[in-house]
């Protein structure tokens, strides 16, 4: 089970690496820092997003400065379904959903791994009720052995008293 989860997690890591490699070329071709984002308004999305500090609004073909003080651009600036950042083919809604699913999957994978490890650790060590049952069984066995030895000694005394004691070598009498 843990190897399946590990394989699944490894696949997600490879998938995320591939996505990052796809996003990297768009982020690496940056414009010089002196150029403002508003100069790329009414041009193309690719030209606007060459500068990583720019945000392309597909709705009105505007290139805007990314609001760095907020994580997501406000709806007054541009709708999330129309906002593009990094690459032109991914909008913010899809990005948020994808990142949420990936984050949830990673958390779920970690939780499953932790639960599996805890279960294995617990199953290796007997719990208190099992230990108590084993201890009681051992005590009963010891008491039974004591009673058996006591009964054997009583029987041997009775045999000795009446001369029925079994000797080690029955041919010794002759």
Swiss-Prot record:
GO function terms (MF aspect): p53 binding
GO biological process terms, semicolon-separated: negative regulation of DNA damage response, signal transduction by p53 class mediator; negative regulation of intrinsic apoptotic signaling pathway by p53 class mediator; positive regulation of protein ubiquitination; protein import into nucleus
PANTHER family, sorted: PITUITARY TUMOR-TRANSFORMING GENE 1 PROTEIN-INTERACTING PROTEIN, PROTEIN CBG20567
Lineage, highest ranks first: Eukaryota, Metazoa, Chordata, Craniata, Vertebrata
Predominant cellular place of this UniProt entry's protein: membrane
Signal peptide: 1-29
Protein name: Pituitary tumor-transforming gene 1 protein-interacting protein
Region (Disordered): 126-155
Localization per Swiss-Prot or TrEMBL: Cell membrane; Cytoplasm; Nucleus
Organism this protein belongs to: Rattus norvegicus
Membrane topology note: Single-pass type I membrane protein
GO CC terms, sorted: cytoplasm; nucleus; plasma membrane
């Amino acid at each position: 089970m843990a190897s399946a989860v590990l394989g699944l997690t490894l696949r997600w890591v490879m998938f995320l690496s591939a996505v990052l490699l796809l996003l990297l070329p768009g982020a690496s071709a940056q414009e010089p820092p002196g150029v403002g984002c508003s100069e790329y308004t009414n041009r193309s999305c690719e030209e606007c997003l060459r500068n990583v500090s720019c945000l392309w609004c597909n709705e009105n073909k505007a290139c805007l400065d990314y609001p760095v003080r907020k994580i997501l651009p406000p709806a007054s600036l541009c709708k999330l379904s129309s906002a593009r950042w990094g690459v032109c083919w991914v909008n913010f809604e899809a990005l948020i959903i994808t990142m949420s699913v990936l984050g949830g999957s990673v958390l779920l994978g970690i939780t499953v791994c932790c639960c599996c490890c805890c279960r294995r650790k617990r199953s290796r060590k007997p719990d208190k009720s099992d230990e108590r049952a084993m201890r009681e069984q051992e005590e009963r066995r010891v008491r039974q052995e004591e009673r058996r030895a006591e009964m054997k000694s009583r029987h041997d005394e009775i045999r000795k008293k009446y001369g029925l004691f079994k000797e080690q070598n029955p041919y010794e009498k002759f």
